[in-house]
Every structure is written in C-alpha cells, then in structure tokens.
C-alpha cells in the first residue's frame, strides 16, 4: 500500500491448501500472442534468422543469411551472446521451470505460491496453466520434473486432463533486478536486456 498498490490479505481465496494470500486488484491478464500479433504493423520482423557473431566496432551482426549493419544494436537474445564484454558469465545464472496445461478451469485468477517448488496458476482460455518445480539448469535430480509437477497439481486440484507440457529456461541475476542498458562501459551504441528472473512480461 505504501507503493500505491490496491491490495488486501485474504483467506481461502487462493487455490492452495490452507493459504493466506496477498490479493492485488485491477491486475491485467496479459496475452503475449495477441500482443506480438500487432507488432509487425509497426516494424518488420525477420524470423528464423540466427545471429552468429557481432562486430562491436563496425556495428555488424552476422547471420546465417547475411550481414546486418545498424546504428545501434540491442542484444535481447535471452542470454547475452557477445563475449568477453560485460563479463555476464559472472553476473547471471540460468534456471529451468516446467508448465503443464489442463482442460479444466481450476482458477478464476492468477496466483503464485511463494515457497520452494511452489506453483503458479494462470487461467488460459477454457483451461488452466500450472507452472513450477524450478531448479538450477543442468541439475535434474532423481525424479522427473514433469511427473513431480503433475503429481502436485493432481494432489491439490484433483483429476485433471493434461493437454500440453513444456519447460522454460530463464536468466537470473544475483540481486533479483533485470539488467537493461549499455552492454559494457567500453562499447558504444550496443545495449543489452537480460536477467528478467522469470518476470519478463511484468518487467
């Protein structure tokens, strides 16, 4: 409330067992596909074009189909690809999480369970998206993560019909704040955006 947010503490509204929740009103359920579908009207997008190398002196981006010259370059490749400038390998780590989509409408709102291996719940069309079971990328552990997520969902929400499942890999900063701005002090007109800590669209 000190930040101007309209919020309240609620009991038994969140779709989690014995949950006390912080409820924030007037939130927007953002559909990224609808947003992206409007972008080509404003500028031209070249898909399936892989950036292989960046010439930071001459502002050239080499791709599999040719070379692109620009006045300014923004490196928004999820994980920064220009090395060794910026020393991002020392500033970032990667985290893997999992999502399943189910046919059933299990929640009317968006919820996030703030605990280790907690769930996120998000309505999508006539069904629901469940996410969670995060771990540091490359450290799988003993049990399959999709199976663990499915077990958690069925334990809390009963029998559900799973339609899709996928994994996401996010870039994390050590202080929890995204990085946006100059790629490195010694590089002119080259910028970076990275480290959204799983809050990409929110940022």
Residue ranges, per PLM feature:
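General small-molecule cofactor/ligand-binding pocket signal
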Residues: 8-11, 44-46, 163-165
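Helical element adjacent to the flavin cofactor pocket in flavoenzyme catalytic cores
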Residues: 20-72, 76
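Flavin-dependent oxidoreductases
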Residues: 54-124
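Short, solvent-exposed loop/turn elements at beta->coil junctions and helix N-caps
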Residues: 12, 51-52, 166-170
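Helix-loop-beta segment of a Rossmann-like dinucleotide-binding subdomain
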Residues: 7-38, 133-134, 194
């Amino acid at each position: 409330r000190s930040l101007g947010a309209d919020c309240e503490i609620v009991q038994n509204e969140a779709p989690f067992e014995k949950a006390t929740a912080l409820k924030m009103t007037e939130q927007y359920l953002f559909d990224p596909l609808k947003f992206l579908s409007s972008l080509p009207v404003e500028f031209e997008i070249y898909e399936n074009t892989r950036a292989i190398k960046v010439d930071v002196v001459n502002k050239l981006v080499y791709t599999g189909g040719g070379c692109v010259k620009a006045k300014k370059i923004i490196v928004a490749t999820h994980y920064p690809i220009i090395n060794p400038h910026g020393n991002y390998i020392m500033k970032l780590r990667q985290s893997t999480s999992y999502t399943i989509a189910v046919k059933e409408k299990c929640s009317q709102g968006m919820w996030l369970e703030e605990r280790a291996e907690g769930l996120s719940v998000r309505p999508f069309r006539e069904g629901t998206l469940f996410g969670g079971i995060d771990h540091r990328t490359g450290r799988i552990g003993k049990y399959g993560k999709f199976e663990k997520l499915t077990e958690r969902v069925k334990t809390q929400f009963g029998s559900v019909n799973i339609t899709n499942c996928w994994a996401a890999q996010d870039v994390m900063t050590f202080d929890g704040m995204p990085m946006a701005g100059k790629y490195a002090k010694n590089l002119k007109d080259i910028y970076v955006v990275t480290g959204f800590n799983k809050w990409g669209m929110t940022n």
